Amino acid sequence: MVFFTCNACGESVKKIQVEKHVSNCRNCECLSCIDCGKDFWGDDYKSHVKCISEGQKYGGKGYEAKTHKGDAKQQAWIQKINELIKKPNVSPKVRELLQQISAFDNVPRKKAKFQNWMKNSLKVHSDSVLEQVWDIFSEASSSEQDQQQPPSHTAKPHAEMPITKVPSAKTNGTTEEQTEAKKNKRERKEERQKNRKKEKKELKLENHQENLRGQKPKKRKKNQEAGHEAAGEEAAEASGPPEKKKAQGGQASEEGADRNGGPGEDAAEGQTKTAAGKRKRPKHSGAESGYKKKKMKLPEQPEEGEAKDHEAPSKGKFNWKGTIKAVLKQAPDNEISVKKLKKKVIAQYHAVMNDHHTSEEELLAIFNRKISRNPTFKVLKDRVKLLK
């Protein structure tokens, strides 16, 4: 769209609105284009259909404007309109309309859009006139197509002979480059995403294989350790039974000697003595082990004076009174803070009972009840004292 400025009043006007502005502004004799700055006197502005773009205006000396396909088609369409104006068989009313149409640079090339544009821009609402104008355009376009078709028919026989050419490496390279250039941004993005997914899968497989390799030696080590332990147990079992076997062998030899009788009786008696000695040894070792067990149990037993305080807890019960007394006796002056006493008693409870069902709130309630209701314990503010 071309814009002009009035040299008389300085108002900017579209090309379509120039005639209206001239009727309002009496001193308007010259119009200048906003983009290129050229001056147009009288009706010369009508020839100024298209002006330079902003890129051409501000691009500099080395700027080369890109040719758009739509512009080329529009110029061909306007050229066709100018040719139709010169034809003699066109009615004067239609010729005037064609002259008005040629002044525009945005003429549609399809029937429905063209007729709608005529109604809005040129204010032509009669359907008969619109049909006449479009019929002239359609006849001109069909005649051009008929003129262009014969050369294509003549060129067909030559095209029927197929020429087989061996594609060279250069042509293959150029075709590949062209196909890559033709790819859209979306296709390139999809290819990148696919490549990333493949790389991630490969990395996962490699990590999985490395983990499997690392796990196999660990399993072997575990199996070896288990084998060593089993071998040690078998060796320990094998070292124990030979005494029994020897004893059984001694008994068998005695029975054989009794059956056979004769000079082997002295030897049999000696064997029985050795077997008896070997039988007595395990008993001695058992007695020693029992003695050691008693020694281990002795430190845990309470003294006679403390026997009443530390009552042996029955199965499934915890001796709250005894543990509280024991903790208070260990404290200086048989006095300790409630917080420390609670911490020690509950820790002892968990160590003895291994009970995970009762909550901490229930344990605290039991602890507070035992302290407050027992007359042997005296609670003063935050401290507990054992009364003698």
Swiss-Prot record:
Name this polypeptide is given: Cell growth-regulating nucleolar protein
Compositional bias annotation for Low complexity: 140-152
Function: Plays a role in the maintenance of the appropriate processing of 47S/45S pre-rRNA to 32S/30S pre-rRNAs and their subsequent processing to produce 18S and 28S rRNAs. Also acts at the level of transcription regulation. Along with PRMT5, binds embryonic globin promoter. Represses the expression of embryonic globin Hbb-y gene. In neuroblastoma cells, may also repress the expression of oxidative stress genes, including CHAC1, HMOX1, SLC7A11, ULBP1 and that encoding the small nucleolar RNA SNORD41. Preferentially binds to a DNA motif containing 5'-GGTTAT-3'.
Disruption phenotype: No visible phenotype. Mutant mice are fully fertile and show intact spermatogenesis.
Residues binding Zn(2+) 2: C33, C36, H48, C51
GO MF annotations, alphabetized: DNA binding; DNA-binding transcription factor binding; identical protein binding; transcription regulator inhibitor activity; zinc ion binding
Gene Ontology BP annotations: erythrocyte development; innate immune response; negative regulation of innate immune response; negative regulation of transcription by RNA polymerase II; positive regulation of phagocytosis; positive regulation of transcription by RNA polymerase I; rRNA processing
GO CC terms, sorted: cytoplasm; nucleolus; nucleoplasm; nucleus; photoreceptor outer segment
Sites where the protein binds Zn(2+) 1: C6, C9, H21, C25
Cell compartment(s), UniProt: Nucleus, Nucleolus; Cytoplasm; Cell projection, Cilium, Photoreceptor outer segment
Subunit and interaction comment: Interacts with PRMT5; this interaction is direct. Interacts with GNL2 and RPL23A. Interacts with nucleolin/NCL; this interaction is direct. Interacts with phosphorylated IRF3; this interaction impairs IRF3 DNA-binding activity.
Gene3D superfamilies per record: 1.10.10.2100, 3.30.1490.490
Stretch forming the signal peptide: none
Keyword Coiled coil in record: yes
